[in-house]
Amino acid sequence: MGARPVLVGFALLAAAPVLIVSMPAIGAQAGRAPANSTLTAVPGIKVGHHTLTERPTGCTVVLAEAGVTAGVDVRGSAPATRETDLLSPVNLVQIAHAIVLSGGSAFGLDSASGVMRYLEERRIGFEFGPAHVPIVPAAAIFDLSVGDGRIRPGADCGYQAARAATDSSVTEGSVGAGAGATLGKAGGMGRSMKGGVGSASITLPSGLIVAALVVVNAAGDVIDPANGQVVAGVRAADGKSFADARKMLRAGGPGGVIAPAGRQNTTLGVVATNARLTKTEATRVSQMAHDGYARALAPAHTPGDGDVIFTLATGERTGNTDAGQVGALAADVMAGAIVRAARQATGVPGFPALRDLK
């Protein structure tokens, strides 16, 4: 029997990946899971976080210092983004050197300036005389309701996150851009929970790697696609069980309308792969990866969301790659990363995490 795919948090039934985040991964060769099952499983990708001490907020930086093909799909109706137009397939620049995910809403986009400074100091970017101009798209979540909203990530936060970036397994939970992330706000902030950063990856016997990192700051619930059960989300009146946002949306009348706080949300994702993709194909992968949001978040892509997914393709794996295959796998690992974000989160005063409800 041939080598089996390595699915971190997944199992294969027939040809379709099924999310089973509670089960251990099965190694392709040695019968073990890979040492790194996060975004940095893709060679050439580094991730760093910086979390502010003054309040729960911060930023997360994905470095691709060599410059890699990049695409994006901004699916939410209320995005806070920077340089995403540059990643359109019809525009000139084909690569990015980093992606910044930040708290602080639109103010947090300043974090990208610090990452640009970090990269220019290392002569990374497009050279124009004495200057080097790195391409650093960014997106931010709304977390101003957690702690003192006057405290926001800025350029120094981005610089420190870039300095901290490594190719080691990504630290998950309530760190970096996920420090102030919350979920379950459809029932009001008083019934919400802590969100955060999650990551997952898949490696096929062919050597293809597809990985995802996500910052979950959702209005509703995180759903485990393996069983359709709520993992974390809107808490019921007892503060321990779940109200189920899907039932709330169908109830009508009192309790059937998303609370105003349910409009203060955004989920941000980055897909990375060692496949060789064009800019158009990377954009398509971003589009397909949003299926992972739809599987693991209820609801997703609402008028109050700024949902964004970036894709980085390093091209390290030579030969032809089906962008459709990469996109389908990206949706799977994105869903897995979302579930991990909920499970790895840690609570702060007023916002319990899943582990606090047990």
Residue locations for each model-derived region?
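Signal peptide processing junction and immediate N-terminal pro/mature segment
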Residues: 21-30
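Small-residue packing motifs within transmembrane alpha-helices
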Residues: 5-12, 333
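A structural signal for small-residue-enriched, beta-sheet-centric alpha/beta enzyme cores
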Residues: 31-106, 110, 121-358
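Bacterial N-terminal signal peptides
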Residues: 9-21
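N-terminal secretory signal peptides that target proteins for export/translocation
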Residues: 1-3
